[in-house]
Every structure is written in structure tokens, then in C-alpha cells.
């Protein structure tokens, strides 16, 4: 599948990109190159191959959960403009 100049102009318009006349041939070639790679990858026979969640079979070692900071909720509530029942009150922005 190859893109024509009019296709690239339409894509640029939809993406709100301002391309000048000098950029169109270069962008068209770049997009066609990318689509060529996609076509090449789609042509590979992947029957019988299990999809991978991650290309490397490595697992992260997780540290144990530990409280590292003190609870400063009361201090933050004290400097907030408005609070009620432990909640921050903010102006309504969507009606």
C-alpha cells in the first residue's frame, strides 16, 4: 500500500499539521517507508508462535512495602482554602 500526495495532504489536514510544498515529497517517502515495514512484518508467518507480553523473560524484584513518610494529612488540611469532613472542597468546573 503506497500513499499518494493527496493522501498525505489529507492526513496532514486531519492531524492539523502545516506542511509546505517542499516537505510533502519527503513526508510521503517517509510514510511509505514506514508502511512498507508494516507490510513486511505482516507477511511473516506467525502460526504456532505464542505472543509475548514482554520480549525479555525478566522479572522485576519488588521491594517490600514500607511506610517511609509520616502522615501529614492534618498539616495539608490546615493550609487548604476549604475542607469538610477531611475532604478538600474545590470550585465546580463542569456543570
Swiss-Prot record:
It comes from the Bacteria. GO terms for molecular function: asparaginyl-tRNA synthase (glutamine-hydrolyzing) activity; ATP binding; glutaminyl-tRNA synthase (glutamine-hydrolyzing) activity. Its EC number is 6.3.5.-. It catalyses: L-glutamyl-tRNA(Gln) + L-glutamine + ATP + H2O = L-glutaminyl-tRNA(Gln) + L-glutamate + ADP + phosphate + H(+); L-aspartyl-tRNA(Asn) + L-glutamine + ATP + H2O = L-asparaginyl-tRNA(Asn) + L-glutamate + ADP + phosphate + 2 H(+). InterPro entries: Asp/Glu-ADT_sf_sub_c (IPR036113), GatC (IPR003837). Keywords: ATP-binding, Ligase, Nucleotide-binding, Protein biosynthesis. Gene3D superfamilies: Glu-tRNAGln amidotransferase C subunit, N-terminal domain. The keyword Ligase applies. SUPFAM superfamilies: Glu-tRNAGln amidotransferase C subunit. GO terms for biological process: glutaminyl-tRNAGln biosynthesis via transamidation; regulation of translational fidelity; translation. Allows the formation of correctly charged Asn-tRNA(Asn) or Gln-tRNA(Gln) through the transamidation of misacylated Asp-tRNA(Asn) or Glu-tRNA(Gln) in organisms which lack either or both of asparaginyl-tRNA or glutaminyl-tRNA synthetases. The reaction takes place in the presence of glutamine and ATP through an activated phospho-Asp-tRNA(Asn) or phospho-Glu-tRNA(Gln). HAMAP family: GatC. Belongs to the GatC family. Heterotrimer of A, B and C subunits. This is Aspartyl/glutamyl-tRNA(Asn/Gln) amidotransferase subunit C. It comes from Pseudomonas putida (strain W619). The gene is gatC.
Amino acid at each position: 500500500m503506497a500513499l499518494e500526495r493527496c493522501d498525505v495532504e489529507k492526513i496532514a489536514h486531519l492531524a492539523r499539521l502545516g506542511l509546505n510544498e517542499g516537505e510533502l515529497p519527503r513526508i510521503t517517502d517517509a510514510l511509505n517507508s514506514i508502511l512498507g515495514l508494516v507490510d513486511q512484518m505482516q507477511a511473516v508467518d506467525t502460526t504456532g508462535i505464542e505472543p509475548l507480553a514482554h520480549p525479555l523473560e525478566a522479572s522485576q524484584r519488588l521491594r517490600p512495602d514500607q511506610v517511609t513518610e509520616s502522615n501529614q494529612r492534618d498539616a495539608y488540611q490546615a493550609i487548604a482554602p476549604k475542607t469538610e469532613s477531611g475532604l478538600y472542597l474545590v470550585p465546580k468546573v463542569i456543570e
